[in-house]
């Protein structure tokens, strides 16, 4: 072009005009973008399980084959491999979580609960009028969370054993993992660190 600067500006203007429907300068991590994407008719892909099938969308196949990058069969293979990788990864994470809850957290909490109960008995035997409200509050709370943990663990085991596809792991196993983490995280704030089987968040953040 004779006037490079003008040609560049014209090209930028043309490109912006043609693609303005996908430009968003707000918070892409908030509901603001979800609402805006819906207004623009853009897909809202919430997880990798939802994204992977795009490998074999007609438009994807057409583009990859046109450019000589991959064939339809290769794209289908890649889609299946990615879905299997995801399912395998979540399966490993879930079973690791099950193992840790069953062999580390639950036994440690039981030991702590027994210790608190024994402490209450010892204090009461020494002085019948002693106020053990604090110990009782801890005992009740820890026991309740222990029951929640066991129930969540059973649910996660069932979900993991039944899961067969990436969709199963995403829609059933991941929520079950989150449900197990909730009471365990709360127990970490209650159980004496001497009984807790792994470093706490506080120890990792401030004592390392």
Question: Where are the language model's segments positioned?
Answer:
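C-terminal amphipathic alpha-helical interaction region
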Residues: 12-208
């Amino acid at each position: 072009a004779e006037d490079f600067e003008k040609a560049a500006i014209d090209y930028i203007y043309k490109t912006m005009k043609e693609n303005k429907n996908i430009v968003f300068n707000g918070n892409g991590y908030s509901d603001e973008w979800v609402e805006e994407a819906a207004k623009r008719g853009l897909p809202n892909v919430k997880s990798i399980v939802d994204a992977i099938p795009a490998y074999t969308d007609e438009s994807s196949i057409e583009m990859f084959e046109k450019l000589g990058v991959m064939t339809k069969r290769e794209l289908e293979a890649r889609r299946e491999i990615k879905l299997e990788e995801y399912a395998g990864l979540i399966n490993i994470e879930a079973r690791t979580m099950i193992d840790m809850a069953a062999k580390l957290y639950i036994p440690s909490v039981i030991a702590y609960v027994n210790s608190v109960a024994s402490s209450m008995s010892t204090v009461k035997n020494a002085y019948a009028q002693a106020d053990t409200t604090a110990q009782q509050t801890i005992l009740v709370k820890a026991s309740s969370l222990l029951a929640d943990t066991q129930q969540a663990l059973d649910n996660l085991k069932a979900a993991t054993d039944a899961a067969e596809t990436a969709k199963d792991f995403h829609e059933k196993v991941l929520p079950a993992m989150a449900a197990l983490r909730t009471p365990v995280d709360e127990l970490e704030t209650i159980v004496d660190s001497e009984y807790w089987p792994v470093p706490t968040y506080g120890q990792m953040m401030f004592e390392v």
